Each structure stands twice: as structure tokens, then as C-alpha cells.
Design a protein with these regions (language model features):
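Compositionally biased terminal segments of proteins
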Residues: 1-160
Length: 160
């Protein structure tokens, strides 16, 4: 899947979030590529502040193009964890992490930055700030027993 396809799928999800007034930001490899060295990725990571009362409409608005399981979404909200949705045609996965109540996560949401993602300057999405991408990558590196060069290379790419 090439970058325009990745952004096309990501934008579909984000437009639904915006329609439902769900605060979000893109993190992970897509964010580190936006601020540093581009690299291939197999998914999009989005942090979102989804509330239980938004799940029904979220499922309704996504189910024609994505596989989405409302029970998984409710469980992710309950346990402040994650769930994924898969684009039916492109088979591209979007991992959605529920915003945790940790001070860092709440601050990261307030520090998110909007960037243009295509030649059409109206196509803008919120990304985690470069500093928050670095901190998140270092946290994932530590949780992964400090063996993933990908996380460190992403950090170095942003710092350059």
C-alpha cells in the first residue's frame, strides 16, 4: 500500500471522528514519518477520546467500508486500551488507542498539531506533536524490552 492510500484510509476514519466530535491525533509511524524520515508502515495508529455513547454512531458510519466490532470498542473504552478496524477493500488496519487518563496522554491531546497531508491543502489532520511522538516512541521502545531499532530510528529521524 502506498502513502496516498494510507492517507486515504486514515482520512476516512478521521472524517468520521470529526463528524462525531471525537478528539484524536495520529501517532506511531505515520506521525514519525510526517516529522522525520518517511518509512513504510503496515497500519495507522490513532489516539482518540471516544465515549461509550458515540460507539453506535461510530459503528454505523464506518461499517460500510470497515470491519468494526462494537463490543471491542466498548471493551477498549472500559479498559482504556485499543481496538482495530480494517478497511474492507484495501485490507488496511487502523489501530485506535483510547485516550488514557494519564496526565501525559491528556497533555499530548492538547499539544496535537494540524498538518496538511496532501497537495490539496484542505486535507489536514491532527498529529501528535513531534516531542510527544518522540516520548511515545521511547515508551514503546522500553515496553518492547529495548530491542526494536525501528522505534529508535524513528526518534533519530525526528531529531535530525
Amino acid at each position: 500500500m502506498n502513502p496516498p492510500d494510507i492517507f486515504e484510509v486514515t482520512l476516512k476514519v478521521i472524517r468520521v471522528f470529526e463528524k462525531l466530535n471525537i478528539a484524536y491525533y495520529v501517532g506511531g509511524s505515520l506521525a514519525s514519518s510526517a516529522f522525520g524520515m518517511p518509512r513504510t508502515t503496515i497500519d495507522t495508529d490513532i489516539v482518540a477520546n471516544i465515549k461509550p455513547e458515540q460507539v453506535f454512531l461510530l459503528e454505523e458510519l464506518l461499517k460500510n467500508e470497515f470491519y468494526i466490532d462494537a463490543d471491542m470498542v466498548h471493551n477498549a473504552i472500559r479498559y482504556q486500551s485499543s481496538f482495530n478496524i480494517i478497511h474492507s477493500e484495501m485490507l488496511f488496519k487502523v489501530d485506535i488507542f483510547i485516550l488514557k487518563e494519564r496526565p501525559f496522554d491528556c497533555q499530548a491531546l492538547s499539544r496535537r498539531v494540524q498538518k496538511t497531508v496532501s497537495a490539496d491543502t484542505s486535507q489536514k489532520i491532527f498529529f501528535a506533536s513531534p516531542e510527544d511522538v518522540i516520548l511515545s516512541k521511547l515508551e514503546w521502545y522500553k515496553m518492547g524490552r529495548e530491542v526494536s531499532d525501528r522505534q529508535l530510528n524513528d526518534v533519530l529521524g525526528i531529531l535530525k
